[in-house]
């Protein structure tokens, strides 16, 4: 037994030394290419991953369609309704939760906001070269064309553009109180301007974790798609939340196939399937039937995952 214990200690020590060596090699490589004006996003992702590894922090990406109950699931894990999300996919922002006391918001840059304005108006064959051009246009006439969610987005920019530009002059990142976080997360007229909400809570359960409440899938927003892919590629654990009454739609299947096309779900990542709102089930047999259906659907895309049935109420 002593020989076995010594063997395991030596084995662990060898792996630890290999990890440290690899980590140092990557840091040196990053230092060499840091001034090369290419692949900035990739370089930043690698840097962030190394920082998390150094500090032994696990990044958990929570995914699902816009109404799957991701936020309610995270709140259930946290033990209170800390997380409030916008009901409007057009104005929604990614929320990043971690241990701490000072919460922050990262605003969209003018370029990002302009891109979203033009995306919303693309169907109407309208575009603007600058946000100032947009603000100076006939917005009353423009708003007559828009759907409800689009109208909320455009009206928010019209109403608070001066506030937004004033905040940008100081910084992209602003510290806000826990009470204000809810405003910037869930109210269209403020959430419109937010790229990321950094919610920090002094909860022991969050120590050693970063939890990302990703934007809803298939939102027809290129920024949302880009951010979803970035979170996917950098998460250590992927939780995929589906709703009991529509447990595996074509959209879910397309997303999982897209993950596999991106070469995600590799050996270093864990994937768990969460069926939310099982309190809607008639009985245990009803739950089992849905679990079997989801397992079969996952098998059809060659993915075999642990499935958890929960109620976030």
Language model features: what each stretch is:
Residues 1-37:
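Charged, amphipathic alpha-helical linker segments immediately N-terminal to NTP-binding catalytic cores
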Residues 52-313:
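Globular "head" domains of long coiled-coil molecular machines
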